């Protein structure tokens, strides 16, 4: 027989707050959840994401050790 009273209390209508305003309700073991980011204000989901043109770590490594194919072609010429 399962043990009694070992499961946390379930709140099927837990309120989720972002910046002091209620944004949605979900099921949770906490009655209220406070979040910094949610799908309504995240840049990826709102379409305001900015593409930052930065060099990746792999490209930086390859350039540092001269392993990029484009760099080898320039150095051989």
Swiss-Prot record:
One of its GO terms (biological process) is translation. InterPro entries: Ribosomal_bL28/bL31-like_sf, Ribosomal_bL31, Ribosomal_bL31_A, Ribosomal_bL31_sf. Gene3D superfamilies: Ribosomal protein L31 (4.10.830.30). GO terms for molecular function: rRNA binding; structural constituent of ribosome. Coiled coil: none annotated. Keywords: Ribonucleoprotein, Ribosomal protein, RNA-binding, rRNA-binding. Binds the 23S rRNA. Belongs to the bacterial ribosomal protein bL31 family. Type A subfamily. Part of the 50S ribosomal subunit. This is Large ribosomal subunit protein bL31. The lineage of its organism: Bacteria, Bacillati, Cyanobacteriota, Cyanophyceae, Synechococcales.
